[in-house]
């Protein structure tokens, strides 16, 4: 849900809302915007399936939804969208999660259809965002790709996002959350990819979350957090933390946790119960002006 902020608070923070009814703001050389649209039309679904070389897509794909963060001084753009996320799903190609026999019938589109789950129907993605340096048409260099864009490199680091500092009381200048895709796994659970952003006078922070629950079988949580502190003009750096968690219902039951599905509906409240299987921290140095 987008927030409404007092104009005086925005002004004192050096921020201004985007014009023409756009959702977002400009602050300290950053333009941060969320985009919203409807789910893919049947024609768009066919186009996406062709591009992704698949005959399967989530039930609800919000192809026009996006979060875009652009550093105006360098034309560096960090953005999040469903197509790139699904490209990551297709590339990773995980084996299908085994579904209880009693629930397999739910995946049939026709009563007589045989259920063959030979693909990752959970749409699990390793996606943690897209980034690029957009170059002006007059300044396209040889190292840029044909679109006039140069790629960026994340570096592994020991730095950590200061979550304690983020919990301090500070005015929220802008907050929004967008859904990229969602699938109810034929009423057998949920697969959901969302991204939300929060902008304060001192920094911006975002969370990209893939949440999967295959009822009675598996839970999977893949989260990407990014943080940027304003005022780092000499060496502007974005920190990124990736954390993957996963557990079977059987393993959680063995630890004494309840298996009631109502307990496992909110990933925010249960994340600490799921063991970490991967954790990395990286940084992105914003390049000089192109």
Curated annotation (Swiss-Prot):
One of its GO terms (biological process) is TOR signaling. PANTHER family: GAF/PUTATIVE CYTOSKELETAL PROTEIN, TIP41-LIKE PROTEIN. One of its GO terms (cellular component) is cytoplasm. InterPro entries: Phosphatase_reg/MetRdx (IPR051330), TIP41-like (IPR007303). May be involved in the regulation of the TOR signaling pathway. Indirectly activates the PP2A phosphatase via interaction with its suppressor TAP46. Could play a role in cytoskeleton functions. Widely expressed. It comes from Arabidopsis thaliana (Mouse-ear cress). It holds the Pfam family TIP41. Belongs to the TIP41 family. Signal peptide: none annotated. Considered as a reference gene in terms of expression stability throughout development. Interacts with TAP46. This is TIP41-like protein.
């Amino acid at each position: 849900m987008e927030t409404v902020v007092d104009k005086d608070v925005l002004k004192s923070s050096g921020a201004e809302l985007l014009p023409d009814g756009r959702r977002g703001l400009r602050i300290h050389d950053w333009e941060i915007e969320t985009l919203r649209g409807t789910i893919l039309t049947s024609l768009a679904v066919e186009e996406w399936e062709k591009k992704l070389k698949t005959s399967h897509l989530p039930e609800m794909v919000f192809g026009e939804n996006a979060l875009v963060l652009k550093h105006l001084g360098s034309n560096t753009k960090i953005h999040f969208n469903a197509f790139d996320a699904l490209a990551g799903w297709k590339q990773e190609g995980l084996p299908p999660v085994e579904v209880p026999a009693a629930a397999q019938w739910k995946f049939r589109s026709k009563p007589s259809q045989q259920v063959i789950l030979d693909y990752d129907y959970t749409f699990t993605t390793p996606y943690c965002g897209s980034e690029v340096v957009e170059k002006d048409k007059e300044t396209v260099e040889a190292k840029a790709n044909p679109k006039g864009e140069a790629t960026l490199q994340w570096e592994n680091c020991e730095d950590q996002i200061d979550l304690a500092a983020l919990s301090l009381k500070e005015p929220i200048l802008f907050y929004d959350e967008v859904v990229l895709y969602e699938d109810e796994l034929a009423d057998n659970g949920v697969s959901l990819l969302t991204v939300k952003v929060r902008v304060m006078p001192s920094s911006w922070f975002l969370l990209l979350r893939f949440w999967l629950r295959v009822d009675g079988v598996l839970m999977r949580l893949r989260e990407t957090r990014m943080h940027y502190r304003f005022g780092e003009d000499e060496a502007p750096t974005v920190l990124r933390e990736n954390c993957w968690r996963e557990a079977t219902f059987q393993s959680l039951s063995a630890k004494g946790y309840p298996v009631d599905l109502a307990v496992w509906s909110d990933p925010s409240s249960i994340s600490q119960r799921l063991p970490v299987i991967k954790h990395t921290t990286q940084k992105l140095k914003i390049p000089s002006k192109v």
